[in-house]
Structure formats: C-alpha cells, structure tokens
Amino acid sequence: MVKGKKLDETGETKKLSIRGKVNDMYSVYAIPLEYLYYNDQNGRINTAYKKYSSTNGLLSPEPGDSEYNMIFEKFIYESNEKAMKETKQSILDKLQQEPGVVLPDGRVIDGNRRLTALRMIARENNEDRRFNAIILPLYVKSKYDEKIIKELELDLQLGREERVNYDPIDRIFDVYNTIEVEKLMTIDEYLSLIHISEPTRPY
C-alpha cells in the first residue's frame, strides 16, 4: 500500500498522457519495495499465471516479500532471462534510469523488470533499494479506471519500439482476455493502442 505513506520525491517528473486526466506531469517518488506488488493482470505473464493457477489456485496480491511476489518475480525472470539480466546490470551500473508507474494500492503497472532487478539486488546484497515511480490515482476495482489502466499498460509495453516484444502466446491470450473475457475494449481500440493496422489483427 502506497497511499497514505510518507514518500521521498526524487525531484524528477514523468510526462504521461492518460484519458480523462488533465495533469500529464507527475512527480516521481522513491518507493520502498515492501509497499509494492506485481500486477496479476499483466499481459506479459498471463499465460504463466494461468498455468500456475490451474494447478495451485489463484493468488491474493500481497506486497513485500510475500509468496505472491516471489512467484510473480519468478514469472518475470523466466519470461525473458536475457532482458532481465541486462536490466539488472544496468541498474547496478547506472541506477534506475526510467521511472515506473504504480497505483495507490502498490500495484506496479509499468516496470516489472526494473522492480524484479531491484528486488534481486536488494536481496543478494542485503541493501535497501527503492523503486522510483509515479503514482497514478486510478483503482482496479473501478471498471472505468480498469479500462484506462489497460490502455496505459498497452501503450507503455506494446506501443513503443524500444520495449521487449510480447511472447506470441501471451499476446493472443491478452487480446482474448481483454476483449472477450473482461470486455474492457473492442478489437479496434486494442489495435490502435498497440499501433497495429486492421490487416494484421492478432487473431
């Protein structure tokens, strides 16, 4: 839980355009890792989580060194070990360069690899590490906000060339889950957010 905590500002700001929000400049905070937890709705690791939950059941999100976070950390690491090692080395060499995005309850919307790298470094070196991130006043229990959160996730993780591409299976599952199961948006809305034209639909 981040809301209500006294957090240090880093002095940085991050520009982020969000539908329905007037302010697009947000202050960056140094957030203790124990306040944060992974996003169980993240499209990149949905297939890994579904496979796990089919045998072990669903997990309840918990911050800090919880079983939930340890399992999701493993999902993130194994989803792309090469990118994970590069992110970890980059943080060791130059600290965290790009702020993440966090919700008031501590859910990390953007920055899974950075969070994982920081958690691993803190654990291996017995160091106090902070996750630099902006805090968006959005709530996953609100259906309206849930759609905005998904739009933001797609824009940050899929709509920019420098991001590591989705695994094809994760992409297909995320499309199906977002459109058919959760009914958060239409196929055209999804495609526009990930910058794919009509002829190359994911399904």
Question: Which positions does each model-derived feature cover?
Answer:
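Short, flexible helix-coil linker/hinge segments at the edges of structured domains or between repeats
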Residues: 125-173
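Residues that form generic nucleotide/phosphate-binding pockets
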Residues: 90, 155-157, 178
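Short, charged/polar connector segments at secondary-structure boundaries
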Residues: 1-129
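Short, charged amphipathic recognition helices of the HTH superfamily
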Residues: 182-192
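Single conserved hydrophobic/aromatic residue that forms the stacking wall/gate
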Residues: 194-203
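Short, amphipathic alpha-helical "recognition" segments used to contact nucleic acids or chromatin
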Residues: 168-184
